[in-house]
Curated annotation (Swiss-Prot):
Belongs to the class I-like SAM-binding methyltransferase superfamily. Erg6/SMT family. Gene3D superfamilies: Vaccinia Virus protein VP39. Its EC number is 2.1.1.143. The keyword Transferase applies. Coiled coil: none annotated. This is 24-methylenesterol C-methyltransferase 2. The gene is SMT2. One of its GO terms (molecular function) is S-adenosylmethionine-dependent methyltransferase activity. It comes from Arabidopsis thaliana (Mouse-ear cress). Keywords: Lipid biosynthesis, Lipid metabolism, Methyltransferase, S-adenosyl-L-methionine, Steroid biosynthesis, Steroid metabolism, Sterol biosynthesis, Sterol metabolism, Transferase. The keyword Nucleus does not apply. Pfam families: Methyltransf_11, Sterol_MT_C. One of its GO terms (biological process) is pattern specification process. InterPro entries: Methyltransf_11 (IPR013216), MeTrfase_SMT (IPR030384), SAM-dependent_MTases_sf (IPR029063), Sterol_MeTrfase_C (IPR013705). It is an enzyme of class 2 (transferase).
Length: 361
């Protein structure tokens, strides 16, 4: 073996060690390794076909004619992206404003804890996490409040991941996870002391339907807080660039059309809620929530090569590269939406279910 061959062989080994220690290692501490990437509940041989079906369905989100199919495709979306989210982002599938002097992890936790502080629950009370994902916010909120948290997600794979994480964190006594559609929740009327949703109800075809369900299961006098994805007052429908950005966000995040910020409170009032407080948590003086997306561009290219290699050798399912590429493009649209101020993923609305029907009339 000549010296040039030895050099390239050594370089390849060094690169391989770097990837597995510096890329795959940190991801494993988040709960998912690159070598474990899968299609969730979708069998490996069907990942690529499911991705194509998803992309075709959400090609023009606001023109979707069969809204009843949206929940099924949202389920497909989370089968496709959950492992990649955990590996590349963490267990909390949402954004938070940057906080000077704080890590992304701490900023995320504080953003989650604020939600439960707003609804003023006490230790031992039962609260609902509407669209809980793999349970990152649930665990932070249960630890902070000592309330019993019941999470619901439409995706069975996420249910299993959340239960695994809850047990590892020693929080399975406080955290329960249910597989179900938040448009038809399997809970009794007036059964929760509070509820929250963190960037989750944006997947509902009609916001009124999920708000009505949350209203139904809350006890009278209890509060609900939501961080909503919205277009802001800066969005101009006649601006082609604005439209491109918003459509890019919708397609890449399984959204059947983003709502305008002015529609959120009106929808909540329509189902019977009183509005306690409303604020865009992304507005100044809040630090940019998209900083982490911009900082992660180098990591994306690094991770994309990992995904390509794992897919080529058959470790990751075919179609994983397409999904990863879609998420990178979506991250660019999200960043542009944040920088231009036309989009916010954290329009906060705090609502209260009246003590009696007469109060809301």
């Amino acid at each position: 073996m000549d010296s040039l061959t030895l050099f390239f062989t050594g370089a390849l080994v060094a690169v391989g060690i770097y990837w597995f220690l510096c890329v795959l290692g940190p991801a494993e501490r988040k709960g998912k390794r690159a070598v474990d990437l899968s299609g969730g509940s979708i069998s490996a041989e069907k990942v690529q076909d499911n991705y194509k079906q998803y992309w075709s369905f959400f090609r023009r989100p606001k023109e979707i004619e069969t809204a009843e199919k949206v929940p099924d495709f949202v389920d497909t979306f989370y089968n496709l992206v959950t492992d990649i989210y955990e590996w590349g982002w963490g267990q909390s599938f949402h954004f938070s404003p940057s906080i000077p002097g704080k890590s992304h992890k701490d900023a995320t936790r504080l953003h989650e804890e604020m939600a439960v502080d707003l609804i003023q629950v006490k230790p031992g009370q039962k609260i609902l996490d509407v669209g809980c994902g793999v349970g990152g916010p649930m665990r932070a909120i249960a630890s902070h409040s000592r309330a019993n948290v019941v999470g619901i997600t439409i995706n069975e794979y996420q249910v299993n991941r959340a239960r695994l994480h809850n047990k590892k964190a020693g929080l399975d006594a406080l955290c329960e996870v249910v597989c179900g559609n938040f448009l038809q929740m399997p809970f009794d009327d007036n059964s929760f002391d509070g509820a929250y949703s963190i960037e989750a109800t944006c997947h509902a075809p009609k916001l009124e339907e999920v708000y009505a369900e949350i209203y139904r299961v809350l006890k009278p006098g209890s509060m609900y807080v939501s961080y909503e994805w919205v277009t802001t007052e800066k969005f101009k429908a006649e601006d082609d660039e604005h439209v491109e950005v918003i459509q890019g966000i919708e397609r890449g995040d399984a959204l059947p059309g983003l709502r305008a910020y002015v529609d959120i409170a009106e929808t909540a009032k329509k189902v019977g809620f009183e509005i306690v407080k409303e604020k865009d948590l992304a507005s100044p003086p809040a630090e940019p929530w998209w900083t982490r997306l911009k900082m992660g561009r180098l990591a994306y290219w690094r991770n994309h090569i990992v995904v390509q290699i794992l897919s080529a050798v058959g470790v990751a399912p075919k179609g994983t590269v397409d999904v990863h590429e879609m998420l990178f493009k979506t991250a660019d649209y999200l960043t542009r939406g944040g920088e231009t101020g036309i989009f916010s993923p954290m329009h906060m609305i705090l609502c209260r279910k009246p003590e009696s029907p007469e109060e809301s009339s």
